[in-house]
Structure formats: structure tokens, C-alpha cells
Swiss-Prot record:
EC number(s) from the headed UniProt entry: 2.6.1.37
Alphabetically ordered keywords of this record: Aminotransferase, Pyridoxal phosphate, Pyruvate, Transferase
Family matches, as InterPro entries: Aminotrans_V_dom, NH2EtPonate_pyrv_transaminase, PyrdxlP-dep_Trfase, PyrdxlP-dep_Trfase_major, PyrdxlP-dep_Trfase_small, SP_NH2Trfase/AEP_transaminase
Full protein name: 2-aminoethylphosphonate--pyruvate transaminase
Record-stated family: Belongs to the class-V pyridoxal-phosphate-dependent aminotransferase family. PhnW subfamily.
Function of the protein: Involved in phosphonate degradation.
Reaction(s) this enzyme catalyzes, per UniProt: (2-aminoethyl)phosphonate + pyruvate = phosphonoacetaldehyde + L-alanine
UniProt modified residues of type N6-(pyridoxal phosphate)lysine: 198
């Protein structure tokens, strides 16, 4: 089916993912694939190589794809990376850091959480002090872009502290990889986790882990799960030409390969980041002009998603704003912060500056309805 023959989506998704995708990403999903076919597995291998190339110019890294949402990939990485006598330190300043701590609890791991609060920037010195005070800690995990608020955490500084003390560093780059320039070697990350349906602008269905090969090779027999055994999945892909251990989301994989092509066509991560930053600049300028305030100071804010404080305006509520904007072609996100009444608007995906100008106009029209 040609892209132009698709019905137009009734709204643009201004969310942290799943997000709006291009017509051409959708179009390539109209073909069926056999999971055992060499042509299909060649696509998988190409994706794996391209992910590593996106992550670093350095040597010694590999990648593995894992069925399911991004959380499946996080659980696979945590559940496979930690030895049974290891201990995980989770650095948290939001829902997704808390989720990693929750996963550790479910898996019966020894773990500790260093909590900076939902609007607090993680302090690398406190991370260092915490590790030094507990020699049992073997692995440290942190979220790069905490979409609870939209904060971009100082992962490079944290990584320097972690690696200087000889610990394994795990980075949840779910909502940043492909949209924010980074080098996994510079970050010091031994495992970096992301998902198909975020900044690379594919569709939901699998996550992936980019790992230091020497670390992943040590993970045999560690997994607490059969289907989420990251080492065995990697070994299968390595030795059998891209084959997955269990049924893979074939259409999603093909869409992701197309999304990678479109990232290249856009000029790579730096150019995509520039578009996201311009999207956010237009959004925040327009929303501030309408009287909305951002939750975070600019110095802490990512270009991925922005949390706005709900105004104390008579008659205003999020659900009404949501419906007004949806009727005008935009879907936004409710807040996730417990410390304040907020809502969120994403600026990633197949979304462009002209879309943000239209959103601001729609928000202005919607606000008139509230008086």
C-alpha cells in the first residue's frame, strides 16, 4: 500500500511514545515476513549493527533486540546483568527510576535506591559517596531522560563516578537514544537500554540493549527469566544470523529498519535533536504566552517532553483541555508528578515546528472556552 493511500490519522500524538510515525514507516508494515527467512534475519542483523554505530564510534560493543515494551528490555537487562550475589543501586528522580527499583524487588535482587525526589537533579557526588559507603554494590542504574518531568539527568557525570569505582553502569536511555547526541563509551555505560517507539520513531513491539561485549559475555546463567534472558537472546542472534529465540514482531522490525533510514535521511541524531529542540522552543514560548508555567527550570529540561503546571484558573481542568485539543487534532499527556498538579506535552516523533505552531493556536482557542 502506498503511503498516500493511508487514511490520515485523526490526531498528532504529543506524547513520550508511542508517538506519531511517518506514512512510510507505516507503509512498510503491509508485508508479512517469515521469522526463519534469511532476508528477514538480515534486516535484524543490519539493525543491530546500525544501533551500535549510533551508540558509539568505539569498539567492543554489541546489541540485542528483545520482544515487548521498553520495560521488558529494562527487566531483561537488569535480570541478566546482575549476578545472584550482586547488588543494584538505582538512582531515581521519577516514576521510571522507581520502576527499576520495583523490578529489582520483583526479581528478588539485593538493591538500594538513592532517591532525589521528582524535581531533584541527581548529584554525582552523592552517588559516589553512596557507592563508597556500600562495597556490596556491584551495579548502578539511572534513567537518562526521566519523562515523569522531562528532566535530562547528568548521566555522563554519574558514569564517571560509577566507573572510577569499578562498578557496572546501566543507563535507561528509553526516551533519549536517537534524539539526544550521546556516545555510550563517553557515558561509561556498560548496558544502554531503549525502545523502538521513541526517538528513532518506529512503532511499539520491541526494545533493545546496547552492551559492552565483555560485560555481556559474563552474563551466561544469570537471568531470572526464560523469555527475558538477554544473554541467550544475544547468543542466538550472534550465532544464528539474527534469529530470535521466540517469535519476533516482524512488522515492527521492518518498520524500525525504515525508521533508521529516515533518521539518516534527516541528517542523523544531531539534526533530529535540533528539530526536537525547535519544537520545544515554539511550544514553551507559546504556552507561556497563554499563562502556563513549566515545572522545571530550563537548565534541567530535555527537548523530549515538557511538564506544565496546571493553572489555578476557574473552570480549568486537564480532562477538558485534553478533549478540546483532541477535537482539534492533538493528543497530550496527563501529569505523573505527585508533588504538583501538571500535564505534559511531548515534542518528539514525526512532529515538526509547524505542528507546534498549530498546537499553540489550538491551545489558545481551547483556553477561550474556559473563559
Amino acid at each position: 500500500m502506498a503511503p498516500r493511500s493511508f487514511p490520515e490519522n485523526p490526531y498528532i500524538l504529543l506524547t513520550p511514545g508511542p508517538l506519531s510515525t511517518s506514512p512510510t514507516v507505516k507503509a512498510v508494515m503491509m508485508r508479512d515476513w517469515c521469522t526463519w527467512d534469511r532476508d528477514y534475519n538480515a534486516i535484524v542483523q543490519d539493525i543491530r549493527e546500525r544501533l551500535v554505530a549510533l551508540a558509539t564510534a568505539g569498539a567492543g560493543y554489541t546489541s540485542v533486540l528483545m520482544q515487548g515494551s521498553g520495560t521488558f528490555a529494562v527487566e531483561a537487562a537488569l535480570g541478566t546483568a546482575l549476578p545472584h550475589d550482586g547488588k543494584l543501586l538505582v538512582i531515581s528522580n521519577g516514576h521510571y527510576g522507581d520502576r527499576m527499583a520495583l523490578i529489582a524487588g520483583y526479581l528478588g535482587m539485593r538493591s538500594a535506591k538513592l532517591d532525589f525526589g521528582e524535581t531533584g537533579r541527581p548529584d554525582p557526588d552523592r552517588v559516589r559517596d553512596t557507592i563508597e559507603s556500600d562495597p556490596a554494590i556491584t551495579h548502578v542504574a539511572v534513567v537518562h531522560c526521566e519523562t515523569t518531568t522531562g528532566m535530562l539527568n547528568p548521566v555522563e557525570e554519574i558514569g564517571r563516578a560509577v566507573k572510577s569505582l569499578g562498578r557496572v553502569f546501566i543507563v535507561d536511555a528509553m526516551s533519549s537514544f536517537g534524539g539526544i547526541p550521546m556516545d555510550i563509551a563517553t557515558l561509561g555505560a556498560d548496558f544502554l537500554i531503549s525502545s523502538a517507539n521513541k526517538c528513532i520513531q518506529g512503532v511499539p513491539g520491541f526494545g533493545f540493549v546496547i552492551a559492552r561485549r565483555s560485560e555481556l559475555e559474563q552474563c551466561a546463567g544469570r537471568s531470572r527469566s526464560l523469555s527475558l534472558d538477554l544473554f541467550q537472546q544475544w547468543k542466538e542472534m550472534e550465532t544464528k544470523g539474527g534469529k530470535w529465540r521466540f517469535t519476533s514482531p516482524t512488522h515492527v522490525v521492518r518498520a524500525f529498519a525504515q525508521a533508521l533510514n529516515e533518521l539518516d535521511d534527516e541528517g542523523g541524531v544531531a539534526c533530529r535533536n535540533a528539530r526536537y529542540r525547535e519544537n520545544r522552543r515554539i511550544l514553551t514560548a507559546g504556552m507561556r504566552a497563554l499563562g502556563f508555567e513549566c515545572l522545571l527550570p530550563e537548565a534541567l529540561q530535555s527537548p523530549i517532553i515538557t511538564s506544565f503546571l496546571t493553572p489555578g484558573r476557574p473552570g480549568f481542568n486537564f480532562n477538558s483541555l485534553y478533549q478540546e485539543l483532541k477535537s482539534r487534532g492533538f493528543v497530550i499527556y496527563p501529569g505523573k508528578v505527585s508533588e504538583a498538579d501538571t500535564f505534559r506535552i511531548g515534542t518528539i516523533g514525526h512532529v515538526f515546528p509547524e505542528d507546534m505552531h498549530r498546537l499553540v493556536k489550538a491551545a489558545k482557542d481551547a483556553m477561550h472556552r474556559f473563559g
